[in-house]
């Protein structure tokens, strides 16, 4: 592939991850907007539905929309981490495995996957922390309504709307606790040696 073309494709691939979360939420709101959203227009245009679906009006459909937005934002980072991990494995290892009669399935299971464990741990940990810290996308999609409320939004509203600083702080510490557990998981996997 052309090197310039590869750079452009890489830049386009990481765009969802590089954009601020609130901007991602606003862009997806145009897709899922109840009356004139792109998805409703598309589904009506091809005849799948007759009337617009209220994607942002129900807690369950809003949860699905928020999940789509977070996955869309997290996948590019995970892909970059996996690409870096795969490129860090010396090609001599694969050549030796092929000479020894290794099939693609066995090479992936016994060589690629074990050598990529630190990279996968980083990607999974980062993606999990991102999922815990979802706030901006929810505000962009549903405002401060109860439909999309999670513990971070509840903490924000408790602290700054109801001025209950103690309870809001305690809720934030709960989120911090879960993020620390994920961080410890990552650090334990990071310290494991990878033998080539």
Language-model region placement:
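A structural signal for multi-pass alpha-helical bundles of membrane permease subunits
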Residues: 1-196
């Amino acid at each position: 592939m052309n090197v310039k073309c590869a750079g452009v494709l890489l830049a386009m691939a990481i765009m969802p991850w590089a954009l601020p979360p609130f901007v991602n939420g606003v862009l997806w709101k145009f897709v899922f907007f109840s009356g004139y959203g792109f998805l409703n227009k598309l589904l009506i245009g091809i005849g799948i539905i007759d009337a617009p679906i209220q994607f942002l009006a129900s807690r369950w459909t809003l949860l699905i929309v928020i999940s789509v937005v977070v996955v869309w934002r997290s996948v590019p980072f995970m892909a970059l981490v996996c690409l870096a991990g795969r490129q860090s494995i010396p090609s001599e290892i694969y050549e030796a495995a092929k000479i020894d009669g290794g099939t693609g399935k066995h090479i992936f299971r016994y060589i690629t996957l074990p050598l990529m464990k630190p990279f996968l741990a980083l990607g999974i940990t980062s993606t999990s922390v991102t999922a815990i810290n979802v706030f901006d996308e929810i505000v962009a999609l549903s405002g401060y309504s109860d439909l999309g409320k999670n513990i971070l939004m509840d903490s924000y509203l408790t602290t700054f709307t109801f001025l209950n600083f103690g309870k809001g702080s305690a809720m934030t510490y709960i989120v911090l606790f879960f993020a620390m557990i994920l961080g410890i998981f990552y650090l334990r996997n990071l310290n494991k040696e990878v033998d080539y």
